[in-house]
Regions:
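C-terminal structural segment of proteins
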Residues: 1-151
Length: 151
């Protein structure tokens, strides 16, 4: 969750509501309003000891904006994926939570078969705009690489 401060008062906001798209407000990318400051990002305790993965693809250098990026957190138990969250950035106005991949992987063992399936379902429902069709297969490849990190 996000902790936001304004005028000495704080409020909490779920991470899912922090990033906003142009349909909400074309002038902002986040739910922060005038004089708001993001002061904390809190991760639930249930993710302590989890495996984390992040990868970005950019045209040039590490400081460039990513064309596409992926973040994943996963907990494993007994060789199986007990729980995970996966999100992709750079593919729409807000981070895209990949619930279809999450649902596919829960309770499964990481391995080549799950990599292939993740790659296939990662971009389901995604619609390319002009000149960015390459992002759709890239989403799948990054999802597969994230899953590979669990093997």
């Amino acid at each position: 969750e996000m902790v936001i401060s304004r005028d000495g008062k704080t409020r909490k906001m779920p991470a899912e509501k922090f990033f906003i798209g142009p349909a909400t407000d074309i002038t902002r990318m986040t739910a922060l309003k005038k004089n708001d400051i993001l002061v904390e990002i809190r991760l639930p305790k249930k993710w302590a000891g989890a495996k984390y993965y992040f990868e970005k693809v950019a045209d040039r250098q590490t400081w460039d904006f990513s064309l596409v990026n992926i973040a994943m957190v996963a907990k494993t138990s007994g060789g199986k994926i007990a729980d995970l969250r996966m999100a992709c950035g750079g593919v729409q106005c807000t981070p895209r939570r990949m619930t279809n991949v999450e649902d596919l992987l829960k309770g499964e063992s990481a391995g080549a078969e799950m990599e292939k399936l993740s790659k296939r379902v990662a971009a389901q429902g995604a619609k390319a705009l002009n000149y960015n069709h390459f992002k759709i297969p890239l989403m799948g490849s990054l999802a597969a690489r994230a899953v590979r990190s669990l093997s």
